[in-house]
Amino acid sequence: MTRLDAQDARIEAIVGNDEETSFDDCVDKFYDHLSKSLQLPCDVTGIEDFRWEEYYVIGPGSPKEYERLRKNQPSYQDTFELVAIEQEVHSEWMMFYEDLAGCVRRKSDGKEFYLGLAEIKAVDKKSVNYQLLDDYAVWFVNNR
């Protein structure tokens, strides 16, 4: 079985046949599964630059301004402690309102944010949390 086949099997075990289930019901099923399975707290970081960062990371934004803004805004380069996950949270830092919210605390200064769970990954690639978050992110971005 390939890595992708194994991932598809894990996802199907959580949501069932997602073609027969509404997107919201699948998100609920993932929330229930992750609530029971994630080992919190755990260290996480961004999968890729957060929405607000694109202007600075791949656009014409000033590096000096980017560093200034990073002091008060979450960055994909930061390491956070994922302390909880929640449903129906809307945060300016989340790219998709349908996403589950990860309540995170930045390790460098203790600032707390809500980030989209599909936008973060566990730092420890060998942990069960890495696989759980990756499975959710893959399902979410492919089905939203």
Regions found by a protein language model. Give the residues of each.
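Basic/aromatic-rich interaction segments and small domains that mediate binding to polyanionic partners
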Residues: M1-I47, S62-D135, N143
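Short, polar loop/linker segments at the starts of domains and inter-domain junctions
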Residues: E54-K64
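Short, catalytically relevant binding-site loops at active-site mouths
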Residues: D49-W52
